[in-house]
Amino acid sequence: MKNYIEIVDVYARQILDSRCNPTVEVEVELEDGTVGVAAVPSGASTGAFEAVELRDGDESKYLGKGVLKAVDNVNTIIADELVGMNVLDQVAIDKTMIELDGTDNKAKLGANAMLGVSLACAKAAANFLGMSLYQYIGGVNAKVLPVPMMNIINGGKHADNNVDLQEFMIMPAGAPSFSEALRMCSEVYHALKSTLKSQGYDTGVGDEGGFAPNLKSNEEAIVVIIEAIKKAGYTPGKDIFIALDPASSEIFEDGKYNLAGEGRVLTPEEMANYYVELAEKYPIISIEDGMAEEDWDGWKILTEKIGDKVQLVGDDLFVTNTERLAKGIKLGVANSILIKLNQIGTLTETLNAIEMAERAGYTAVVSHRSGETEDTTIADLVVAVNAGQIKTGAPARSERVAKYNQLLRIEEELNDMGEYRGLKAFYNINK
């Protein structure tokens, strides 16, 4: 097998994401004509420690959200350096871009520019070798299909309603296969829609395809999801579990958590107890960003209280960054990391974060962003690293469904070699 193939062209363009904001798409062409194409996602609630997403700031165009600077960085600075390099050496490609940027947070070239190139190179390499992307990244051991973490009620920054917590999700950990898990979630989604309608609630959807009703409280969102699970013919806590993403950094003010929709302001200890009560009352298997990104003491309290029973995922806390993750591991906070490619900006650094997490006994959940495209890289990535969990929205809106459909194709390709771990994906908690 050939182990060297030159990059002959690197080209970027500005396209639109699912929130009608510009983003970067990159094409990488190889000497034999093979091409790899990748598009970059974007978040609404972003961690303060994420790599920099370069925006133009010209208010007269796309409200300042244009990405022509990032596109130009790809077409000039990055292309000049990468043309002639071996596309099969992903580490060297990413290292070259990191050195070209020269900042701690990708502020010069932009994480959106660098990630587009990094992923397009990986896709071009996979295409050249005639391999699926998950096989190219993960090798022969890539075989685990993920449990979906499916956002079906949106609140917080993802919706215009009075629900404080950002995401209420279902996880079909009791399903026998990925395709069955997807079917179960789809049926619950339909049941939830009819349940909300029958109770007089709006069934408009948020950024990630989940419903965004004006519920009376955060707990009511859980109650109505439980009702929908039962209505669809499944057992909560056996077939399907609940997962939450409060996105607590968004409601953290002056050292306290402001649940404005419920008229409550809680200390970190009280916030931890709030989750404890919910986890005792309902089949909650995972809580993401239960505490704010800089509330390390609050995270410690929460982890000590329920870290043995509930998956505690660090998103804004860790931002797919090995330095932040190493601190969390040392302090003993959280037990899982959310993986978002654009938080760190290259495929290599993303894989390093996943490896560090797994060595420490932390699970990894591969995730989309609220601003997505039709790009399906994360579907391949989650199988490549055998993470066992994926978070990519409701089974609605084509930019979300694209990832699920790609996973169906991968499941079909893996056939008997594929493995759906279900509850075993939560190997570091007692369930």
From Swiss-Prot:
Binds a second Mg(2+) ion via substrate during catalysis. It is an enzyme of class 4 (lyase). SUPFAM superfamilies: Enolase C-terminal domain-like, Enolase N-terminal domain-like. (2R)-2-phosphoglycerate binds at Q166, K340, R369, S370, K391. Keywords: Cytoplasm, Glycolysis, Lyase, Magnesium, Metal-binding, Secreted. Pfam families: Enolase_C, Enolase_N. It is found in: Cytoplasm; Secreted; Cell surface. Belongs to the enolase family. This is Enolase. The gene is eno.
